[in-house]
UniProtKB/Swiss-Prot annotation:
This is Small ribosomal subunit protein bS18. Part of the 30S ribosomal subunit. Forms a tight heterodimer with protein bS6. GO terms for cellular component: cytosolic small ribosomal subunit. SUPFAM superfamilies: Ribosomal protein S18. Gene3D superfamilies: Ribosomal protein S18 (4.10.640.10). One of its GO terms (biological process) is translation. GO terms for molecular function: small ribosomal subunit rRNA binding; structural constituent of ribosome. The lineage of its organism: Bacteria, Pseudomonadati, Pseudomonadota, Gammaproteobacteria, Enterobacterales. The gene is rpsR. Keywords: Ribonucleoprotein, Ribosomal protein, RNA-binding, rRNA-binding. Pfam families: Ribosomal_S18.
Length: 79
């Protein structure tokens, strides 16, 4: 039983933006934004990334603005 539980040890998640002491997330910073979306274009939730709620809201707003200005695609492929 202990070997099964050892397999599911979770590492402590930390907020990347707090560690970098980032104040605001900008929609023009595509390198930062692209780390928070998957290939299909969906925003990765904070329960997976460990991002704090304040920065997750800023990140979602920046991604939506970048999509609106065609800096990021809405989906992976349009056919």
């Amino acid at each position: 039983m202990e070997s099964i539980m050892a397999r599911f040890v979770r590492h402590r998640k930390f907020c990347r933006f707090t560690a970098e002491k980032c104040i605001n997330i900008d929609y023009k910073d595509l390198v930062t934004i692209q780390h928070s979306i998957i290939e299909s274009g969906k925003i990765i939730p904070s329960r997976i990334t460990g991002t704090r709620a304040r920065y997750q809201r800023q990140l979602a707003r920046a991604i939506k603005r970048a999509r609106y200005l065609s800096l990021l695609p809405y989906t992976d492929h349009h056919q």
